[in-house]
Amino acid sequence: MSVCPENDWESYSYSTDNGPVIVGFHTKSNTINQNEYPYCARVLITLKKPNVHGGPLQDEAQVLWDMEDRLVALLDEHKTPCLMLGRLTHGGTRELVFQVADYGPFRPPVGRWMGEHGDYETDVSEHDGW
C-alpha cells in the first residue's frame, strides 16, 4: 500500500485576506486510527514563479506534481509509516501534509528528496496531532 492513497480525494478552495487557498484532501482520513499516526509533518515547497493568486503557473504545476510523486515513491520505497492526507497551495507555497507514526523513519527519505530538489526552497514543519 502506498503512503499516498490513490482514491477518495476531493478538493475545494476558499479565500482569505492573503489570497486564495486550494485544498486537496483524502476523504477517508476520518476512518484512520489517529493513534497509529500521532504526528503531523508538512513538507513545504516555495514556488519559483507563483501566479497573481499564489498558485503555480502551468509549467511549474507539472514540476510540483513530479516532485510529489518522487517524494511518495521514496517514502514507499523505505516503507515509511506515514500517510499523505492533504495538499494545500496558497501564497506561493505548496504544502504536502503527512500523518506520521514516527519521525525517525520519515526524515531520511524526506532529506534525500530535499537534496534531489535543491533548486527549490523546501522545508518541513513537524508537530503533534492531526
Model-derived features with residue positions:
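Charge-rich, low-complexity segments
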Residues: 1-92, 101-107, 123
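Conserved short beta-strand edge segments in small beta-sheet-based binding/regulatory domains
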Residues: 115-130
